[in-house]
From Swiss-Prot:
GO terms for biological process: L-arginine transmembrane transport; L-histidine transmembrane transport; L-lysine transmembrane transport; mitochondrial L-ornithine transmembrane transport; ornithine transport. Mitochondrial transporter of arginine, lysine, homoarginine, methylarginine and, to a much lesser extent, ornithine and histidine. Does not transport carnitine nor acylcarnitines. Functions by both counter-exchange and uniport mechanisms. Plays a physiological role in the import of basic amino acids into mitochondria for mitochondrial protein synthesis and amino acid degradation. This is Mitochondrial basic amino acids transporter. Its main location: mitochondrion. Residues 287-306 have a biased composition (Low complexity). Keywords: Amino-acid transport, Membrane, Mitochondrion, Mitochondrion inner membrane, Repeat, Transmembrane, Transmembrane helix, Transport. It is found in: Mitochondrion inner membrane. Residues 283-306 are annotated as: Disordered. InterPro entries: Mit_carrier, Mitochondrial_Carrier, Mitochondrial_sb/sol_carrier, Mt_carrier_dom_sf.
């Protein structure tokens, strides 16, 4: 189990590095003023950030997700695996329930982390910056708003993450079974990448409107008096002012991000598991009495261990 946590964390780091620029663009598109929009679309937003803030502008708020990454991956993989074993049967329904449980519990870390990330991503470049970094952002929020401020957007995060992780693990399970992912398959890694990337896209599509609401609630009040009284009020005001399209704002950059992020994540997880398990097998074979002198090759990871 500890090995799964380690591999998952390594994969998560790779995924964050690949996907964070897309996330920055997504957040800015979601919360920009519709009456005087600063960006015309995903590509224009990318170009504007790079031109005005350099490439580093795309990585604003990176420290926050990296800080919480170890704990989030440990929770997700640990809770999902233990819940699945507790349910007793590896079925599609149980995969969904186990994933949903993992998604709900990791919100304890995910919500404050995304709050800091969102506020840093919206922060303008220059000497007048309100926050020096992720930790400083959270400290200042706590000083001014208390524990409630740190957990701003928790309910909307729960409503997004719980079904999203359920859909993710369900889709991944169905795809790996359908593609016949088995140890020793020469195409195992590409299959895992395809399954992971597709699962990421599917999970985002399933709960994206709630992600828009979550981003708006977490950014609310930065420019003065808060506009929204809660989730329902945010949805109502957003719909009345901008129509149903508001709930798809930033979707293009999110889907562009979803596949490569999950591809990077699962590629890294596979490499880490394959290497470490290969080393362990070799050590075990050398330590065992009468063991063969031919070292065993590293076995590719079982899909269920990811």
């Amino acid at each position: 189990m500890a090995l799964d946590f380690l591999a998952g964390c390594a994969g998560g780091v790779a995924g964050v590095i690949v996907g964070h620029p897309f996330d920055t663009v997504k957040v800015r598109l979601q919360v920009q003023n519709t009456e005087k929009p600063q960006y015309r679309g995903t590509l224009h937003c990318f170009q504007s950030i790079i031109k005005q803030e350099s490439v580093l502008g795309l990585y604003k708020g990176l420290g926050s997700p990296l800080m919480g990454l170890t704990f989030i991956n440990a929770l997700v993989f640990g809770v999902q695996g233990n819940t699945l074993r507790a349910l007793g049967q590896d079925s599609p329904l149980n995969q969904f329930l186990a994933g949903a449980a993992a998604g709900a519990i990791q919100c304890v870390i995910c919500c404050p982390m995304e709050l800091a990330k969102t506020r840093l991503q919206l922060q303008a470049a220059g000497p007048a910056r309100a926050y020096k970094g992720s930790l400083d952002c959270l400290v200042q929020i706590y000083r001014h708003e208390g524990l409630r401020g740190i957990n701003r957007g928790m309910v909307s995060t729960l409503l997004r993450e719980t079904p999203s992780f359920g859909v993710y693990f369900l889709t991944y399970d169905v795809l790996t079974r359908a593609m016949g992912c088995e140890p020793g398959d020469r195409l195992l890694v590409p299959k895992l990448l395809l399954a992971g990337g597709t699962s990421g896209i599917t999970s985002w599509l399933s709960t994206y409107p709630m992600d828009v609401v979550k981003s708006r609630l977490q950014a609310d009040g930065l420019q003065g008096t808060p506009r929204y009284r809660g989730i329902v009020d945010c949805m109502r005001q957003s719909y009345q002012a901008e129509g149903w399209q508001v709930f798809t704002r930033g979707l293009a950059s999110t889907l562009l991000r979803a596949f490569p992020v999950n591809a990077a994540t699962f590629a890294t997880v596979t490499v880490v598991l394959t290497y470490i398990r290969g080393e362990e097998d070799q050590v075990d074979s050398e330590a065992a009495p009468g063991a063969s002198t031919t070292p065993a090759g590293p076995a590719l990871a079982q899909p269920s261990s990811l």
